[in-house]
Amino acid sequence: MPPALVDIPVDGPAAEVYRTSPEEGWRVIRTKWRVTGVVPGLIEGGGRASGYFTSATGITIYRGDAWPEENLGDAFIADCGSNLVHRKKIRRSGVELIAERPADEQKVEFLTSTDLWFRPVQFANAPDGCLYLCDMYREVIEHPWSLPENIKKLLDLNSGNDRGRIYRIAPAGFKQPGRPQLAHATTAQLVATLESKNGWHRETAARLLWERQDQAAAPSLKKLLKESKSPLARLHALHALEGQGMLREAELLTALSDTDAAVREQAVRLAEKFITNGAFPPALWTKLRELAGDPDIAVRYQLAFTLGEVRGGERLTSLAAIARQDAGSAWMRAALLSSLAEGAGELFTVLSGDPVFRATEAGQEFLRQLAALVGAKNSATEVNVVLAYLGQLNEPALAFSMTSALGEGLQRARVSLAQSGGAVAGILERAVKAADDGALPEAARVPAVRLLAHQPYAEAGKRLIALLDQSQPQAVQLAALGTLAKFNDASVGADLLPQWNSLTPRLRAEAVPVLLARPERATELLRAIGAGTIRASVLDSTQVKLLTSYRDATVRELAAKVLAASPASARQPIIDGYAPALSLKGDVAHGKKIYEERCISCHRSSGEGFALGPDFVTVKTTGKEKLLTNLVDPNHEVRPEFVAYVVETKDDESYVGLVVNETSASVTVRQAYGKENVIPRANIAKMRSQGQSVMPEGLEQNLTPQDMADLLEFISTAQP
């Protein structure tokens, strides 16, 4: 499923801002102290004191009528720390929204003040059509906790607590309109006000109509819905009728045929109230099915959700029509899947039989998701239908990947794919041959290797270990390692560790989390370290902490014994040893090579790499001294979003990494090389912070001061 939280600004959450007020002296000093490590605290904006969002607040959409119409729908965001108001234009991209600076405000803000006490914190759309701004007006706006004591004692944190202002932001030549008297308006006047271009007037009239519940409003509301030239008025009329229990099928049919997509979208949502025993009235159902081909994706998106309230096979035709048009949208796929409490197998049959749909990347992804849903529902009839199709599909890579998806769904239902019978045996036999066939392209072998996870380990284990050989393509090796990780057989660790010396650095980096995931594997790894066959340096600091605090007592005790022999040394002497690098001229080209060897698995730079830690472009202005400290001692100062967490599951697995997304149903843990593990909350036994950076210590090992100078130069010149 797509993430519940989506950042829509194209310039990111810490976007550039352009203040006209001078930087406060204390802010400059605090930033310098943080950068040099004198005081703890977040280092934002690459070590700059200002010039980026630090205190965004009061997000408000302009809905008035005093300003030019081009400003309708603009978002206004205050940054009280920078004494300014920022503006964003919002547009749709599919079902998502994108926010970007107006063309005429690329390097300036909508409103700024040179007054350091100007602290905009909130806005309101007012009855006069203007935007009102609340200025808290304080000398210091920062939370006391964010100020070092040596600075705090020089400031009066209460200065201005008897002040504050409200501004009206009005266009040139603005004339104050008459004061509205909506509280005393008649019902007919309130209905007429729904056509106002002023959002405050419309919304107030709508609220009063709902509060009065005057049934006499029905005729005028119905007329407004049919005849108004304002889409917003028609939208208000539609909801006013529904809110007063006066929305009938005739009015809904009118709204479903509206020329404005937003009205049609809302009408589809309200149509759900007309469902009886899983069915719409015939005329309404006919119209809704037509909307599967609506030219606006927002209407189709809402329809995809609404169809989930309907029972019966007829809805599948509409779901299939939407899928054919919109399967490329992850949001639309999620909407379609949410509507398949029943019928996933039937929809799979319809779409898999469409060669045009099946040939597209989006179509294949949706078919995989459908197969997984069929498995999770665990209907024997549907599972057999899918398997029968996959058994005769003459596209091996697609057949293997969809069978894997089916198997993963079955696992969620606590059922084994191998026990499903039917065509499974034949598909697995084909996968075994394809996995071993070096003549096949990687695109066919990788899904075949992954499918081996659904064989018993006694059959698949040796083959997967053999596929770790250096003669195999890296993609096949990684697929084999990832497949090994899915087995809970006690032999996995013992089988994997003898291959250690032949594993590439990339495979070793991915193999360590596999070995740490289960107690019996972690035990084997610790024994190998204790015996000297594997060096303790393969473990970073977060992994050492995981082992020494492991929930299994045997692992904890063994870790304390084995790892105590090589305690982490203090980092400051190492930092001091690299001090000459700060005065050496750096070679960017060589620095890039070091980045590719040591940093690319967790950091992005110039469009390359994986986003576990911060993008180098966001830290390049920190200064080389601070960069050196953070490279050698990553736990010197850790931003909260980069603190490592351990998630332990009820299946006795452990994951260590960054928690990058949380929903009511799952937690997503990101690890090196962009690997993400989505863990259902129902399967989480325990989740805890490690209290330190996800970045390991020791990455500087074997680097000379000149190497460090080259790496620092590369980071300092990073591009987006």
Where are these regions (language model features)?
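Protein kinase-like catalytic domain
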Residues: 170, 603, 715-719
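Beta-propeller domains with acidic blade repeats across secreted/periplasmic ectodomains
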Residues: 1-189, 200-201, 210, 280, ...
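Gly/Ser/Thr/Pro-enriched helix-cap/hinge segments flanking short amphipathic alpha-helices
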Residues: 196, 203, 207, 631, ...
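C-type cytochrome heme c attachment motif
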Residues: 58, 130, 165, 220, ...
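Sequence context surrounding c-type heme c attachment/ligation sites in exported
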Residues: 143, 560, 568, 585-600, ...
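Long, ordered, helix-rich scaffold segments
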Residues: 134, 156-162, 169-594, 619, ...
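C-terminal capping alpha-helices of c-type cytochrome domains
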Residues: 237, 551-569, 577, 624, ...
